[in-house]
């Protein structure tokens, strides 16, 4: 726009010149330019907004002889349009009229008051209630990536460093940022192609010196030594870029961001991008929330509890000590069903985490304060409920929850029970909270009554029957006397206007009232806004303990939720051990069990030094994938601190969970199904350790039989012999069932099925040893494959099983087009049936014919 501005600015009206000056500072963002009751957009902004919002594209004036494109949205409905644009990854600049149109000689003064971007949202209307909305900045040093993450709505700020593109992809999958900041020179932009809201920043946004200064200013420290980030240059640079961007968009110093937390990958069980996708932790394969692990496990009472639970599921702990803290808390909450009363109280708690962020940003709305008031008044009752708890961790949380009687009292006295949505139109503060505000409101609301009172009083004082009090816009308030009585006016009456048949006067009292009345409404609104801002300042003074309280309430909610889930879903507390083992008795898949109409069949699993790999065979649809996924889900839940779906679980240290499951092309990345499969396999073979859990499903199926078998064999052998990770290796290559003969730490298991009346019944039970067959043709039959194809497949199977090297061809292979439309020749049995005259057969002849046809069918 700067080139356009310099070329055409002199040709424009002063108003458009003002717009161009503002737009030049925000070239990559949509500028909402306030004009009266509308926000207008011009040029390319107008075209883009018209396309995205489906609004009318019109024009205003000309530029270089060409009409200027224009689109607009009503001021009162702008929030909805802004929300839609931000959800599409756009950033919106709000430019308001700040000058008085009546006093302006040129165009009304306008300035940018807000910049709304996908990653810096704090307004409740724009946010997903149960999901974090994150701004991520990435700095790159070759294969070392510095990551800084800001949850501006929740008040969390984290940094970390990861090495390698795979690790970066894993973190992107975990964080799912709403907006990503990278340098214009970032070398891995292809990795971000599937993410909206990618913003390229100038290289100087990532300068180390600037970053250090910004962060020290934010946290009011001389240096960053207390944040455990020594030597993390990449992360500090990312943090500096992030803070510079956030402060510019918010027009604020972000007072609710009080500390910087360093995340270490080694503190949590690492889930790579493929594992998060395949295990459907909080997003299913269709991109939805339903039928995910979080969907089953989240019955939290509060939105902030739901968000914390999702963070826990996506980042299971490595520390068994921390896990046991959570387990012990859940056990106590289950005693005498103590979680029930706690859950009911928590259901009345507002989203104080996000409310406090809006308070700090001075963007909290009246209903935010009403919800905060209701939350704070509940805290004493919550404390009483927690007095009986003995668990150390729960008592620590109770202490952090604390009570805030001063703020609760202030908000109870100040805020109406059901206040309006915005402070702009008043009516937020209670009657009696402020004497001056009450007086101003009274003047504004009761002006008519007051004038009648003055009129009555003056008539009694002067005994002048023609006296009346009136008002007009030109002369304001007045006392009017008829011409015959005007010479009897008291000495304190000051002549204001002479009419043909009357005289109008003003008194000092009426003049004082006039000054108050004419400005009372605007003064009342102004004073109410000032008092409202003072309330926000009072809350901000206790922001730190209030934020600690909100986080403690969130954790209390998650633990209470886990207790409810344990009871409702029949979950057990897993035993944690330092031994390398994973022992599950009666394990169940937490999601499949809830959505299936049939009773879920539980299964056992035993991995330890003796058997570190299971080769899993069995029919398609037999339950191999479910068995593998439920194992990973149980591990994740266990290390989140939750109880798990099983009869008994003993689990040792786990550092990573890997999955190679499913199949799909990466069309955007130009990778075939097999290439995706091999990339995921390579990642596992490079990064898995002896403490990892590895799920491998059908490795090698995307290529030729011999290539696939060779790769599957080599991968399984490498995992068993070199890495020795806990591995579940599902395959249809029955040759792999020979591995236990040469590798003592490998065992065979299979899922069972049985044939009954030419149909297949899946038993979904796991047994030792290899499967006897795959039942692939029976599954094809269940899927509705045409009978003639099934018959042909059965013939070819018999030939292959009898040792034939290839299917026998009765005729030269037809061309593809001929084959598509070829008529299937009837079998000998079908021919006999077509010629049969059923009505002419006796019962004995019919029975003999049936036996004959059966024999022909078996021999064909």
UniProtKB/Swiss-Prot annotation:
UniProt binding sites for ATP: 618-625
Output the superkingdom of the source species: Bacteria
Q: Name one GO molecular function term.
A: ATP binding
Gene Ontology CC annotation, any one:
cytosol
SUPFAM superfamilies recorded for this chain?
DNA repair protein MutS, domain I, DNA repair protein MutS, domain II, DNA repair protein MutS, domain III, P-loop containing nucleoside triphosphate hydrolases
Fetch the CDD domains from UniProt: ABC_MutS1
Q: Name one GO biological process term.
A: mismatch repair
Record keywords, A-Z = ATP-binding, DNA damage, DNA repair, DNA-binding, Nucleotide-binding
Q: Does the keyword Nucleotide-binding apply?
A: yes
Gene3D superfamilies according to UniProt: 1.10.1420.10, 6.10.140.430, DNA repair protein MutS, domain I, MutS, connector domain, P-loop containing nucleotide triphosphate hydrolases
Q: Does the keyword Lipid biosynthesis apply?
A: no
Q: Name one Pfam family in it.
A: MutS_I
What does the UniProt function comment say about this protein?
This protein is involved in the repair of mismatches in DNA. It is possible that it carries out the mismatch recognition step. This protein has a weak ATPase activity.
Q: Which family does it belong to?
A: Belongs to the DNA mismatch repair MutS family.
Name under which the protein is recorded:
DNA mismatch repair protein MutS
Write down the species: Hahella chejuensis (strain KCTC 2396)
Task: Print the organism lineage.
Answer: Bacteria, Pseudomonadati, Pseudomonadota, Gammaproteobacteria, Oceanospirillales
């Amino acid at each position: 726009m700067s080139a356009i501005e310099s070329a055409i600015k002199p040709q424009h009206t002063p108003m458009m010149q003002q717009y161009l000056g503002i737009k030049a500072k925000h070239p990559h963002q949509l500028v909402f330019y306030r004009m009266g009751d509308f926000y207008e957009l011009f040029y390319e902004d107008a075209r883009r907004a018209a396309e995205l919002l489906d609004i009318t594209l019109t024009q205003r004036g000309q530029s270089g002889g060409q009409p200027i494109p224009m689109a607009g949205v009503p001021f009162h409905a702008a929030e909805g349009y802004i929300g839609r644009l931000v959800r599409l990854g756009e950033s919106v600049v709000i430019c308001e009229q700040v000058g008085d149109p009546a006093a302006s000689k040129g165009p009304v003064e306008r300035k940018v008051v807000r910049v709304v971007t996908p990653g810096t949202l704090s307004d409740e209307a724009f946010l997903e209630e149960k999901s974090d909305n994150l701004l991520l900045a990435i700095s790159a040093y070759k294969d070392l990536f510095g990551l800084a993450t800001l949850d501006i709505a929740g008040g969390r700020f984290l940094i970390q460093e990861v090495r390698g593109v795979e690790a970066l992809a894993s973190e992107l999958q975990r964080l799912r940022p709403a907006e990503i900041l990278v340098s214009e020179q970032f070398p891995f932009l292809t990795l971000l192609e599937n993410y909206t809201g990618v913003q390229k920043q100038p290289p100087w946004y990532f300068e180390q010196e600037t970053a250090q200064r910004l962060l020290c200013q934010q946290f009011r420290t001389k240096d960053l030594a207390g944040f455990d980030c020594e030597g993390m240059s990449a992360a500090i640079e990312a943090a500096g870029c992030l803070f510079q961007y956030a402060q510019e968009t918010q027009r604020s110093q972000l007072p609710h961001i009080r500390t910087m937390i360093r995340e270490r990958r080694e503190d949590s069980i690492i889930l790579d991008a493929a594992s998060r996708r395949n295990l459907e932790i909080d997003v299913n394969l269709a991109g939805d929330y339903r039928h995910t692990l979080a969907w089953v496990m989240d019955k939290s009472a509060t939105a902030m509890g739901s968000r914390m639970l999702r963070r826990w599921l996506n980042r299971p702990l490595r520390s068994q000590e921390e896990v046991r803290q959570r387990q012990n808390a859940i056990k106590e909450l289950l005693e005498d069903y103590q979680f029930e009363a706690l859950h009911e109280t928590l259901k009345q708690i507002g989203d104080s985490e996000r409310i406090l962020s809006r308070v700090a940003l001075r963007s909290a709305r009246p209903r935010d304060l009403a919800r905060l008031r209701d939350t704070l008044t509940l805290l004493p009752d919550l404390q009483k409920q927690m007095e009986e708890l003995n668990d150390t961790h729960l008592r620590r949380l109770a202490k952090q929850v604390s009570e805030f009687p001063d703020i609760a009292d202030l908000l109870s006295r100040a805020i109406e029970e059901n206040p309006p949505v915005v402070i702009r139109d008043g009516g937020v503060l209670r009657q009696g909270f402020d004497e001056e505000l009450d007086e101003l409101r009274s003047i504004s609301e009761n002006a008519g009554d007051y004038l009648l009172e003055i009129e009555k009083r003056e008539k009694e004082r002067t005994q002048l029957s023609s006296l009346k009090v009136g008002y007009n816009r030109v002369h304001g308030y007045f006392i009017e006397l008829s011409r015959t009585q005007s010479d009897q006016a008291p000495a304190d009456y000051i002549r204001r206007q002479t009419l043909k048949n009357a005289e109008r006067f003003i008194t000092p009292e009426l003049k004082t009232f006039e000054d108050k009345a004419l400005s009372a409404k605007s003064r009342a609104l102004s004073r109410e806004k000032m008092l409202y801002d003072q309330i926000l300042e009072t809350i901000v003074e206790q922001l730190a303990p209030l934020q600690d309280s909100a986080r403690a309430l969130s954790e209390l909610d998650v633990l209470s939720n886990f207790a409810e889930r344990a009871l409702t879903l029949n979950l057990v507390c897993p035993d944690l051990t330092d031994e390398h083992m994973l022992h599950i008795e009666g394990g169940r898949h937490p999601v499949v069990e809830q959505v299936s109409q049939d009773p879920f069949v539980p299964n056992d699993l035993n991995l330890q030094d003796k058997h570190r790999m299971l080769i899993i065979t069995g029919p398609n649809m037999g339950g191999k994938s479910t068995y593998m996924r439920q194992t990973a889900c149980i591990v994740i839940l266990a290390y989140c601190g939750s109880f798990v779906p099983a009869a008994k679980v003993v689990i040792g240290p786990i550092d990573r969970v890997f999955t190679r499951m499913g199949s799909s092309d990466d069309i955007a990345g130009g990778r075939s199904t097999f290439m995706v499969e091999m990339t995921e396999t390579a990642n596992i073979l490079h990064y898995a350790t002896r403490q990892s859990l590895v799920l491998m499903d059908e490795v090698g199926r995307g290529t030729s039989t011999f290539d696939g078998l060779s790769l599957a064999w080599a991968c399984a052998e490498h995992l068993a012999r070199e890495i020795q990770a806990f591995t579940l290796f599902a395959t249809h290559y029955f040759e792999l069932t020979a591995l236990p003969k040469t590798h003592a730490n490998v065992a065979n298991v299979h899922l069972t099925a049985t044939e009954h009346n030419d149909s297949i019944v899946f038993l979904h039970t796991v047994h030792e040893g290899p499967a006897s067959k795959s039942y692939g043709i029976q599954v094809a039959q269940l899927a509705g494959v045409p009978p003639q194809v099934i018959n042909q497949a059965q013939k070819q199977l018999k030939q292959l099983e009898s040792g034939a090297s290839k299917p026998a061809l009765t005729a030269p292979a037809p061309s593809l087009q001929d084959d598509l439309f070829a008529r299937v020749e009837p079998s000998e049995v079908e021919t006999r049936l077509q010629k049969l005259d059923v009505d002419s057969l006796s019962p004995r002849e019919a029975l003999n014919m049936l036996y004959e046809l059966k024999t022909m069918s078996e021999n064909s």
